[in-house]
Amino acid sequence: MIKAVCFDLDGTLVDSERLYLAGNVHAAQQMGYLLTCEDFLPLVGISDAQFQSQLNLLIDPGQQAEFAQLTQDFVDARIDRPESLAQPGADALLRALKLQQIKLALVTTSTAEYTHHMLQNTHWSDVFDVVITREQGRTKPAPDLYLQAMSQLNLPKAQILAVEDSPVGVRSAKAADLTCVQVQDLAPRSHLADELIDNLFELEKMIHA
C-alpha cells in the first residue's frame, strides 16, 4: 500500500521545461543564433554533465553566461503566472493525496530558491511534507536526493512511489530502489520505469488500484 509519493518538479508537476525552451530560443535569437526549440530539446531531462556537453554544441562557451541570464530573465518575467505553470491535473492530484493522508515529497535538482519560488507561485507551499533540492546531495541520476527524501519520510521503500518525467529522474529513483512511474512528456521514454502514464490524471487511479 502506497503511503508516500515523491514527485519530481520540472516537467512532472509544472510545465517549466516548455517555458525554459522558449527562453532558450529567445536568448539565442537575441544573441544572433538561428536556433529553434528542436535544437534545445535534447537539453531537457538530462544530467548536469550531459546538459553542459549539449549546450557547448549550441552556444559558444564564452557566451553562455549571457545566454543563461537572458534565458532566466525571460522565464522570470513569466513565472509568476501560476495558471500557466501547473501540469494538467497536478493541483487536484496533490490536494486529493493530501486529504487521503498520503505523505508527499518533492525531489528536484532545481535550487532551493527556485523551488520555493515555484511552490509559492503554484500555492503548494503547504502541500509537501518533505522538500529536497539540489543542495542536499549529488544530483540525478545519482540516488542521493531520493535517499534523503526516504530518510525524512521514514517509511519502508515498498510504501513509497516516485513520479518522474525523464529517464535521468527514473534512473535516480531506481538507484534508490524505489518503484517509479514515468509521466511521458518532452523527455524520452525510460525502459527502467515500472509504469508509464500519459498524464497525472491516471496516477491517482494507479495508486489506489
Each PLM stretch: what is its role?
Residues 27-28, 47-61, 118, 149-150:
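Helix-loop "lid/cap" segments that line or gate small-molecule binding pockets
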Residues 21, 25, 48-53, 68, ...:
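An amphipathic alpha-helix signature
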Residues 1-42:
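Active-site neighborhood of HAD-like aspartate-dependent phosphohydrolases
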Residues 1-3, 95-98, 111-209:
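Asp-based, Mg2+/Mn2+-dependent phosphohydrolase catalytic module
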Residues 54-92:
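Metal-dependent phosphoesterase signature
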Residues 12, 108-110:
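Conserved phosphate-coupling serine/threonine residues in phosphotransfer and NTP-handling enzymes
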Residues 77-106, 116, 143:
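Short, acidic loop-to-helix structural element flanking the phosphoryl-transfer center
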